[in-house]
């Protein structure tokens, strides 16, 4: 049996496909890849906030829906909280480090005033503004290699990236891992997901064999939190769950740059229920602070 995988054509995306493919080969399944151009690729200089939702996934998922591929592979943080009803999560593989990192000569608390940090994420910009209001942020687009090249050529004094991207691309560069209480990561950061057609039972069964259960539970809990509060890759909300045994440890944060709210939860149970509880806690605090009605 051979699985046809749709994915973006970027270097990072191809590495992620091969990570999934390696798991498939271990159970005797071969794979091929179809490279898909997405809106994010076609408008690579536009700020992500202007491109709308689903810019990294829409065209890739359409290839699966149209039968051009069996499954789609994504960085899970890039897929919308509400997946197309004809699609389903077939698998996630074991999570890479979920943290944000700062690539700069000094750590965040020691950076010089008026330092310029490259990031296009509203969440990251707001966390920086809250922690170090005298530091500047500037939009940056392009793949990871391009961003690092811009940093090394002094276009930026620093960058904020996902640690997982550096690890997957095997990039050797010094960085500072950001504390999750200062910089709560985006939901599902560090997770690679496989989406497939809901009715395709044969392919679905294959991917059940490579799913990492604890990672899936963490992913579902984080998505439940975001579903309650409202958010996505253009949202200033961070959420992270870690599962140890039967216990879930979760943290969620919101910042508008002037104030910051952080809530946490620790309990055993169903990931959806626990994630929803954390979302309700954050929503309650946001109402108390007058951020939402």
Curated annotation (Swiss-Prot):
Catalysed transformations (reactions): 4 porphobilinogen + H2O = hydroxymethylbilane + 4 NH4(+)
Cofactor note: Binds 1 dipyrromethane group covalently.
Cofactor: dipyrromethane
Keywords recorded for this protein, A-Z: Porphyrin biosynthesis, Transferase
Pathway: Porphyrin-containing compound metabolism; protoporphyrin-IX biosynthesis; coproporphyrinogen-III from 5-aminolevulinate: step 2/4
SUPFAM superfamilies: Periplasmic binding protein-like II, Porphobilinogen deaminase (hydroxymethylbilane synthase), C-terminal domain
GO CC list: cytoplasm
UniProt-recorded Gene Ontology molecular function terms: hydroxymethylbilane synthase activity
Pfam families on file: Porphobil_deam (PF01379), Porphobil_deamC (PF03900)
Example GO BP: heme biosynthetic process
UniProt EC number: 2.5.1.61
Modified residues (S-(dipyrrolylmethanemethyl)cysteine): 233
EC class (word): transferase
Role, per record: Tetrapolymerization of the monopyrrole PBG into the hydroxymethylbilane pre-uroporphyrinogen in several discrete steps.
Family: Belongs to the HMBS family.
Note: The porphobilinogen subunits are added to the dipyrromethane group.
Stated name of the protein: Probable porphobilinogen deaminase
Native species: Saccharolobus solfataricus (strain ATCC 35092 / DSM 1617 / JCM 11322 / P2) (Sulfolobus solfataricus)
Source organism phylogeny: Archaea, Thermoproteota, Thermoprotei, Sulfolobales, Sulfolobaceae
């Amino acid at each position: 049996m051979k699985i046809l995988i749709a994915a973006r054509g970027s270097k990072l995306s191809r590495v992620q496909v091969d990570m999934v493919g390696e798991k498939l080969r271990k159970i005797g399944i071969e794979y091929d890849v179809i490279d898909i151009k997405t809106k994010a690729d076609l408008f690579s200089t536009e700020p992500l906030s202007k491109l709308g939702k689903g810019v990294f996934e829409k065209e890739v998922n359409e290839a699966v829906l149209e039968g051009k591929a069996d499954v789609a592979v994504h960085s899970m943080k890039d897929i919308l909280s509400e997946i197309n009803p004809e699609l389903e999560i077939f698998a996630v593989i074991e999570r890479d480090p979920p943290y944000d990192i700062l690539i700069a000569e000094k750590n965040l608390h020691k950076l010089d005033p008026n330092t310029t940090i490259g990031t296009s994420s509203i969440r990251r910009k707001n966390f920086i503004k809250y922690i170090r209001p005298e530091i500047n942020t500037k939009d940056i687009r392009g793949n990871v290699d391009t961003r690092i090249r811009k940093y090394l050529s002094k276009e930026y004094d620093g960058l904020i990236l996902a640690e997982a991207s550096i690890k997957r691309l095997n990039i050797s560069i010094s960085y500072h891992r950001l504390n999750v209480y200062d910089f709560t990561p985006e939901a599902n950061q560090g997770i690679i997901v496989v989406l497939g057609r809901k009715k395709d039972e044969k392919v679905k069964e294959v991917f059940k064999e490579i799913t990492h259960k604890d990672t899936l539970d963490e992913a579902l809990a984080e998505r439940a939190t975001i579903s309650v509060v409202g958010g996505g890759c253009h949202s200033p909300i961070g959420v992270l769950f870690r599962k140890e045994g039967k216990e879930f440890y979760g943290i969620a944060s919101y910042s508008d740059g002037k104030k910051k709210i952080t809530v946490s939860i620790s309990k055993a149970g169903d990931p959806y229920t626990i994630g929803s509880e954390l979302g309700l806690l954050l929503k309650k605090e946001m109402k108390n602070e007058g951020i939402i009605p």
